[in-house]
Swiss-Prot record:
Species: Xenopus laevis (African clawed frog)
Segments in the Lumenal topological domain: 45-63, 120-122, 169-182
Location within or outside the cell: Endoplasmic reticulum membrane
Site-annotated residues for Required for the recognition of 25-hydroxycholesterol: 108
Pfam family, one: INSIG
TM regions (residue ranges): 22-44, 64-81, 97-119, 123-141, 147-168, 183-200
Name of the molecule in the record: Insulin-induced gene 2 protein
Keywords: Cholesterol metabolism, Endoplasmic reticulum, Lipid metabolism, Lipid-binding, Membrane, Steroid metabolism, Sterol metabolism, Transmembrane, Transmembrane helix
């Protein structure tokens, strides 16, 4: 009888961790979908949307799956960052508070806003400016080697996938200037990876603190 109680008690933390992981992933998914819709609204001003504007009013849009893919990617990235930190034995401790995370989100949205509102002389100037802003975002809110490496990897992979989808006619940008889109897309993906990574790390740290406090009370 006592052994059964011990097994049941020991399985509770594992079950709680799985439920917390699912909840964290769901929150990251919702944040990713929300940011995808917000950033699309910013790009509408230049007619360079990643998916047609009517997706906001109809789930039956031809590209309804794009914000869902963004949400899924956001969840994967947000869960991956703290896992990589633990695997490398380098827990991220730089600016670990919610105010810093919110500022990171604001800067990320600001970078997207700049790509939509500011008129640059040419695409090269746009690329260099956004690249500098994206690296500045990493330096200000992350500064970890794992964050930089994952950000670059995410930028390369996401840009490659998006271009393959366009070339294969799965969906297309509404902008006539395709070079303009390619000049800002990698930087946006990089900054987005850093932003979702910071959110994921903060959620994981908050969850870990809650579990520690609960274990102390028990």
């Amino acid at each position: 009888m006592g052994d059964r109680e011990n097994v049941s008690y020991g399985s509770r933390p594992i079950l709680a961790q799985k439920m917390n992981l699912l909840l964290r992933g769901f929150l990251l998914f919702l944040i990713g979908v929300f940011l995808a819709l917000v950033l699309n609204l910013l790009q509408v001003q230049r007619n360079v949307t990643l998916f047609p504007p009517d997706v906001l009013s109809s789930l039956f849009s031809s590209a309804w799956w794009v914000p869902l893919c963004c949400g899924t990617a956001a969840a994967a990235i947000g869960l991956l960052y703290p896992c990589i930190d633990r695997h490398l034995g380098e827990p991220h401790k730089f600016k670990r508070e919610w105010s810093s995370v919110m500022r990171c989100v604001a800067v990320f949205v600001g970078i997207n806003h700049a790509s939509a509102k500011v008129d640059f002389a040419n695409n090269m100037q746009l690329s260099l400016t956004l690249a500098a802003l994206s690296i500045g975002l990493w330096w200000t809110f992350d500064r970890s080697r794992s964050g930089l490496g994952l950000g670059i990897g995410i930028s390369f992979f996401a840009t490659l996938v998006s271009q393959l989808l366009v070339y294969n006619g799965v969906y297309e940008y509404t902008a006539p200037d395709f070079l303009y889109v390619r000049s800002w897309l990698p930087c946006i993906f990089f900054a987005g990876g850093i932003t979702m990574g910071n959110i994921g790390r903060q959620l994981e740290m908050y969850e870990r603190k809650a579990l520690v406090e609960k274990s102390h009370r028990d």
